[in-house]
Amino acid sequence: MRVALGIEYDGSQYFGWQRQAEVDTVQERLEKALSIVANEPIAVQCAGRTDAGVHATGQVVHFETNAVRKDTAWTLGVNVNLPDNIAVRWVKVVDDEFHARFTATARRYRYMIYNHQLRPGILRSGVSHYPGVIDEAKMHQAAQYLLGEQDFTSFRAVQCQSNTPFRCVHEVNVSRQGMYICVDIKANAFLHHMVRNIVGSLLEVGLGNQPIEWIEQLLALKDRNKAAATAKPNGLYLVDVTYPESYQLPKLSLGPLFMLD
């Protein structure tokens, strides 16, 4: 039997999603909890492998099991065995054609900026603090150069293992609510550090250090060294993964949910 789960987690205390030797990861914690409930070893496949410090409100995983359990066992039962900063949000039995990564048609990330001269206390691990005067309207305008299928070499991590630098950005929006600026970007898939590298360069535009057209120029240059530094990890959230409607997976609010001014 193949089971899909929706997962939410605060990634600030983990060395990323993917299981690694001798460090704490989200995948390891989830697999341990699932294995307890299933009473057999469980290995999961995820839609997107988030880096250290990165969060998710809309991660999707699937796994194979011989265990027959009620839905509440895969939600409430697994959550009892998870740390407080990881939670199962929904469960659905799926057919064998479903794959959390390979049947996904799009991923969506939100990057949350706390724009204030003084750093936050309560939300310090859930937002990235950037002081100074940031013009989110200019960031939004510059971000429109990213739309469509393009070569994103300038926004690709040096250690990225993808066979191609081409990705298709479906939509990107930059908006402000009070002290919070949200960079919301959806694409068919993302390169390693692609969102954080894009945000780092958009911030240079928003801070007035570069013109709006700089993003277009960076795309044409195809040179990671010409773009800005990678933005901090703690403001980044995987908020949604899109699948064909035929799978009828549950849909929840995207998040992250903050009390905004």
UniProtKB/Swiss-Prot annotation:
UniProt key word Acyltransferase: no
UniProt family annotation: Belongs to the tRNA pseudouridine synthase TruA family.
Keyword tRNA processing: yes
Catalytic activity, EC: 5.4.99.12
GO biological process entries: tRNA pseudouridine synthesis
Reactions listed under catalytic activity: uridine(38/39/40) in tRNA = pseudouridine(38/39/40) in tRNA
Function: Formation of pseudouridine at positions 38, 39 and 40 in the anticodon stem and loop of transfer RNAs.
Active site: 51 (nucleophile)
Signal peptide: none
Binding residues annotated for substrate, in chain numbering: 109
Protein's name in the database: tRNA pseudouridine synthase A
Organism domain of life: Bacteria
Binding partners and assembly: Homodimer.
GO MF annotation terms: RNA binding; tRNA pseudouridine(38-40) synthase activity
Pfam families: PseudoU_synth_1
Keywords tagged on the record: Isomerase, tRNA processing
